Amino acid sequence: MTITEQKAAQRKAGIAARRALSDTERTHSNAALCARIMALDCFKKAENILLYAAFCGEADLSALAVEAARQGKTLAYPVCGEGFSLTAAVPGPDGWEVGAYGIRTPILSRSEILRPDQLDLVLVPCTAFDAVCHRVGMGKGYYDRYLPRCTRAVKLGVAFEAQQVDAAAVDAYDEKLDGFVTEGGLYFGFDTTEL
């Protein structure tokens, strides 16, 4: 099986696993993973955070977004553009639309744009992940192109335990993350003393 075929299989299995969670499991899991993220020093210290609006059964960070906003943190959301580009947009109160792939997305003309090097923390969704912080995304490479430019940010994947695989199918274009947060634990591929 090729890497592309392995990624497709892991993507399909990971999406099915997260969709299979009951409403009760999903509610408890979302609360637990948001609490884990908010307990990390990298969250506490972050001023500018890129997160995402949950789609297709992804881990929901709404509770984290509410608390982060209450703390005065700046919250940006990804906008997918031409050429598989990604922009971190801070939407105004009336600055939302349903964008590419049916995802709730900021309207760029009604948003402040943050450069990648302004971000302190990037929370990345995935379809599958492994314990050494590799991820399988949706297959377009938006985050893989964007993350190398986030030079000062801690980059954390967010997923449910059910999405973990023994070894994520990755190639030279896939960006390894600094860590992963799930409802059940934390996975880090480096020294965690700074987190």
Question: Model-predicted segments: where are they?
Answer:
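A residue-level signal for conserved active-site and pocket-lining positions in enzyme catalytic cores
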Residues: 14, 51, 75, 123, ...
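Glycine-rich, N-terminal phosphate-binding loop of Rossmann-like dinucleotide-binding domains
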Residues: 53, 126, 184
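Charged helix-capping and loop-helix junction motifs
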Residues: 66, 138-142
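A short beta-strand-loop-alpha-helix capping motif that often carries His-Thr
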Residues: 83-85, 120-126, 139
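N-terminal active-site beta-alpha-beta segment that forms phosphate/nucleotide-binding
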Residues: 2-118
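Surface-exposed, charge/polar-rich loops and edge strands
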Residues: 1-5, 16-23, 107-108, 117-122, ...
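Short glycine-rich anion-binding loops that position phosphate/pyrophosphate groups of nucleotides
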Residues: 55-57, 127-131
